[in-house]
């Protein structure tokens, strides 16, 4: 069964100032699931309490790649376990050179194994650039698919913006997709999304 939630980045203008109040607002709107885009220094126990008092479940987090480096991953795991979150999504990385690509893929592979051992799935959220061929000849999304076990969080608008059909993309990658971001954009992108339910 499909579960729908809200990416808290959508409320980025207010979450940093009042994360607790933002969660109440989201719950009052009728959402049951939230994907965090930062905790702004709040303790895990506080976030857990705010989720509980609003009847919300953390479906995932957008977490910077520094948090999955060997020196930081234990604390990251502890925080996610404390708030009951089983999905950690990397929202982007620096893919500007072939060397950085190799470093990133190695980091994703190492972190994915460690997180999986702790009951947490690692995913990667695309923007348009991951679907475009780099100057060094690689298409990042295809490298992630072929060379890691990381799951995918497909952002339908950014995929469309890169010239792909989001519906066809989601169908092709359905066995690797953990989460889908349904996002509006220019009108032609919105019309394209009406063709199917990714």
Give residue spans per PLM region.
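Active-site beta-loop-alpha junctions enriched in small/polar residues
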Residues: 7-11, 37-39, 63-66, 92-95, ...
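Acidic/histidine-rich catalytic cores of soluble enzymes
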Residues: 117-198
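Active-site groove signature of glycoside hydrolases
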Residues: 82-100, 118-128
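Charged helix-capping and loop-helix junction motifs
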Residues: 20-21, 71-76, 101-109, 136-142, ...
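Glycine/Thr-rich phosphate-binding loops of Rossmann-like dinucleotide-binding domains
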Residues: 14, 44, 98, 132, ...
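Helix C-cap/helix->beta junction micro-motif
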Residues: 53-54, 83, 111, 115-118, ...
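Surface-exposed, active-site-proximal loop segments in enzymatic domains
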Residues: 69-74, 92-103, 192-198
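N-terminal pre-domain/capping segments
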Residues: 1-86, 151
């Amino acid at each position: 069964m499909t579960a729908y939630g809200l990416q808290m980045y959508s409320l980025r203008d207010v979450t940093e100032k009042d994360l607790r109040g933002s969660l109440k607002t989201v719950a009052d709107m009728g959402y049951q699931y939230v994907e965090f885009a930062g905790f702004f220094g709040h303790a895990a126990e506080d976030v857990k309490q705010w989720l509980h008092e609003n009847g919300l479940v953390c479906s995932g987090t957008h977490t910077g790649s520094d948090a999955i480096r060997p020196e930081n991953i234990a604390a990251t795991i502890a925080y996610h376990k404390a708030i009951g979150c089983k999905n950690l999504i990397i929202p982007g990385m620096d893919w500007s050179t072939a060397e950085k690509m190799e470093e990133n893929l190695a980091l994703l592979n190492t972190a994915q194994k460690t997180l999986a051992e702790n009951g947490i799935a690692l995913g990667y959220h695309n923007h348009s650039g991951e679907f475009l061929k780099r100057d060094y000849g690689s298409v990042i999304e295809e490298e992630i698919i072929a060379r890691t076990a990381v799951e995918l969080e497909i952002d339908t608008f950014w995929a469309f913006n890169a010239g792909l059909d989001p519906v066809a993309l989601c169908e092709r990658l359905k066995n690797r997709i953990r989460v889908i971001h349904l996002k509006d954009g220019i009108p032609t992108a919105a019309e394209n999304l009406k063709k199917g339910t990714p």
